[in-house]
Design a protein with these regions (language model features):
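Internal, well-ordered domain-core segments that constitute the primary functional module
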Residues: 1-32
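Exposed, low-structure sequence patches enriched in small/polar residues
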Residues: 22-221
Length: 221
């Protein structure tokens, strides 16, 4: 039927890379870059496309066209940056990552529509302890946003972990290889803890907007 299109019966070729840099003159800081590409295996073999992760980041450099049946159109790709900064004396850290699941056309596209196809996570962790032998108190907060922005009205990026051609998405045996809240979702997490020797007592709150992308698709009229 027109409501269901079977997935390809084919294995997937996945390739990714991660670079991490920790500047020696800034204690506790680490910065990184990540990129990943996947496609169906038979398509990769036919086109000898075995190192797609090293191709140009921007779509203006595509050598194979922009149509859905081109080499670039068959790729499901993404990239992002991440960082973490730990303050040992303050017993605190801040971390975050910003990723895109759809390649930008050029630098201008990235600057003018930064929200298109993006997802991010930011978090804070702080430890309070008066003396080395006293009780430890911890506070944690994390915010994850994966819902599409209003730019979807002009060009749809689809939900995270999904792709129009690689319809299996970023999954392994049916499980999403990513955020546990799932595609199109947002969340906030708070936790307060007390550690007394070997005992830990915690209270946590989590708020999840489950698949807001689907809500927008279903009721946008």
């Amino acid at each position: 039927t027109a409501l269901y299109f079977p997935k390809k019966d084919d294995w997937r070729y996945y390739q990714g890379l991660t670079f991490t840099y920790s500047p020696k003159w800034i204690d506790g800081m680490s910065l990184g870059f990540i990129r990943w590409v996947q496609m169906y295996g038979e398509f990769a073999k036919t086109n000898n496309d075995y190192f797609p992760v090293f191709d140009g980041l921007f779509r203006k450099n595509d050598k194979y066209g922009l149509t859905s049946d081109s080499l670039e159109g068959e790729r499901d790709q993404g990239a992002g940056i991440f960082g973490r900064w730990v303050w040992q004396d303050a017993k605190a850290e801040i971390y975050g990552e910003l990723n895109y699941n759809d390649a930008k056309y050029n630098l201008r596209d990235l600057m003018l529509d930064t929200g298109h196809a993006r997802a991010y996570t930011i978090g804070i962790h702080k430890v309070f302890q008066k003396t080395p032998t006293s009780k430890i108190y911890e506070f944690s907060w994390e915010r994850t946003l994966m819902q599409q922005t209003s730019s979807r009205l002009l060009r749809d990026a689809a939900s995270w972990y999904m792709h129009s051609n690689v319809r299996h998405g970023y999954t392994n045996n049916g499980e999403v290889m990513g955020a546990g809240i799932g595609p199109g979702s947002n969340s906030q997490y708070f936790e307060f803890s007390m550690i007394d020797e070997l005992d830990k007592y915690s209270i946590a709150f989590e708020v999840i907007d489950q698949d807001n992308d689907f809500f927008m698709y279903a009721f946008e009229d």
